[in-house]
Amino acid sequence: MTSRRHLVLGSALLPWIAALPARAQAAPTRLLLGFPPGGTVDQISRHLSARLGEGVRVEARVGGGGRHAVEELMKAPADGSTLLLTPMSMVTLYPHLYPQLGYGAADPVPVAALASLGFALGVGPAVPASVRTLADLVGWVRAGGSSLPGYGTPGPGTPPHFIGALFERGAQCTLPHVAYRGAAPAMRDLLGGQLAVYIGPEGDFLPHLAAGGGAVRVLAVAGERRSRFLPDVPTFAEQGHGATGLDRRELYALFLPRQARPELAQQIAARARAVLAEPATAALLARLGLQEAAGGPAELGEVVRVDHAAWGPIVSRVGFTPES
């Protein structure tokens, strides 16, 4: 979810994108991303420029929480000259949220699943050290332990937003949502004591946990099982919060424009599998708090279908609208 994670993952794919089928290379190949580089723009730009390959360029279509990049993909020709690397929720969740969206979940052509990430709930120095579990957190909130805002997330209408809303309802406590413009400012406020709780990708917490000092404590992870990156942290369900939706994960995937040929998607997916099999790719994903995810067009298409169907009842239960 953070811009650094999107861009570094994109850079790892550029060598094989540069070797796309001949028709795709007849014109510059665009790799669309929906998020800005943020504070690491110089480092990421150098990394990308060294690996772009002939005729390939990364193009950030920033805005709308990633929606604009998907909408740009929908306008592109279906000849392989434009690809999209995006969190899957831009395709599966957003059609439930925005009635005027320029695409549906079935419109982008699935190519390959690349990596998955889990979400976690963590607290910062504004929360007493005695708060070690979700039960402790709920008790502290109910007792009026803080005058600070509720839980922060990287943005409104994102998976962490819904995880927080479902937790608040299940715990029967008042924990308002605070939407940030990305993970970086939210983590800054969490570490600075201006935010009590943050829900976001596990990778957002890992550098601070590795630094030690106890400034950040992760109380729960979303998902059906514990995270390989946070094996000592119990899931929401293990702590008595098993509502549907608290098992949400995110998937990074590649898509082509609507009506792209199946053979083209298969060719690109085969190259993606080769890159994912490289040890350097595995090391990169681990540093970012991501797990490898395998799946070609058919498998990704089924995951998209199931995920889109799962989000509908969750959105209805939370009652989210763009105006809310």
Residue map of PLM features:
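N-terminal export signals
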Residues: 6-24
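N-terminal (or domain-start) structured segment
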Residues: 20-107, 156, 172-201, 206-208, ...
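Immediate post-signal peptide segment of exported/extracytoplasmic ligand-binding proteins
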Residues: 20-31, 77-81, 138-149, 211-215, ...
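Hinge/capping helix and adjacent helix->loop/strand transition within the periplasmic-binding protein
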Residues: 75-81, 96-185, 236, 251-284
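A ligand-binding cleft/hinge motif common to bilobed small-molecule-binding domains
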Residues: 89-100, 166-170, 197-233, 312
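C-terminal lobe and pocket-closing loops
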Residues: 116, 206-276, 309
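An extracytoplasmic/periplasmic, membrane-proximal ligand-sensing/linker region
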Residues: 169, 173, 263-324
